[in-house]
Amino acid sequence: EISECLVGSEMCIRDSYPVGFSGDTHITWESLDFQPYFTSTASNIGYGWWSHDIGGHMFGYRDDELTARWVQLGVFSPMNRLHSTDNPFNGKEPWKYNQIVETVMKNFLKLRHKLVPYLYTMNRRASREGLPLVQPMYYLEPEREETYEVPNNYYFGTEMMVSPITDKLDPVTGLAGAKTWIPQGIWYDFFNGRAYKGGRKVDLWRDIYEMPVLVREGSIIPLKDMEGYDNSIENPEKLEVLVYPGKSGEFVLWEDGGDTPEDLDENWVSTRMTKTADENGTVFIVEAAQGNTAVSPQKRSWKIRFCNIQDKPQEVTVNGQVYKDAEFAEDKKLHGTIVILKDVPADA
């Protein structure tokens, strides 16, 4: 069976799968502001699964906006763990907050569930290769001074970087900002598809409903399709895949049965996805599942979202044959195109 051990921040690692936490946090903006730095630098001593008491544990003050921003950080953390002292006034249930914050909390908690395919793959990578999900910005550019000047920025897996908001909204603009170092290349906003040129420091401003999460060009991000939302922990029959323009890219989705030894290759199934981009256009391929296909659905529906690519695909094929039942739609949120394929055999 898979086991884990929850240990406090003062403890060094003494278990194969430790889940650390930053201690009994106070309910203050200052405490929230420390958590992104504490979370990312925990990776420096092998604490890849690091958590914090989302919303704060005790003392401090009541602030609904603070809770919303802390939940946003928690969703883009290794562990998403809402927690508080045993006090009826400190509960973290979304319905205990004002309507706006309740909506924000619910939306982000659902987003966490969507992210499970990506997160599960990244945690397998951490187990096999020792590369933590959350990494400080200087991990990839250790010679770059700017990466040390943004302690609250971090990479979130291979495809994303995060710059949490830890300040209150400006009462005039209704926005709050986060100092951000954008690495070289083109990066896209995870929530709205806006493109940013990298190699510079910027202040990214967002309302209460969003936070700065950027995706590198050429990325492929597998998500659970939340249509007909449920709390199932089974490998999803419907996947939503975000495909970003620019460079060619590749992502290998890894899945297992969830209750088998993770160190044995025969317990895993992999699905390789590639995107090739050149002057002739973009080709996106989902290869047939490889490995223990019994642990994943035998048929899957795919919702492919091409961010900032508005042209309708010239052709969709399955097993080399034109797939005439493909559905197409405009993706207004990410300024692109959606392609839907239903009930595709896993070995196709």
Briefly describe each language-model feature range.
Residues 1-2:
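Short, exposed "boundary/linker" segments that immediately precede the start
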Residues 5-6, 344:
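Hydrophobic beta-strand core residues of beta-sandwich domains
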Residues 7-210, 214-216:
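Catalytic-domain carbohydrate-binding cleft regions of carbohydrate-active enzymes
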Residues 81, 92, 96, 106, ...:
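Context-gated lysine
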Residues 157, 184, 279-281, 334:
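Residue-level signal for tight coil/turn positions that link beta-strands
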Residues 188-208, 315-343:
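Solvent-exposed beta-strand/loop surfaces of large extracellular or lumenal domains
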Residues 213-321, 337-347:
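Accessory, solvent-exposed terminal regions and/or long lumenal/extracellular loops of proteins
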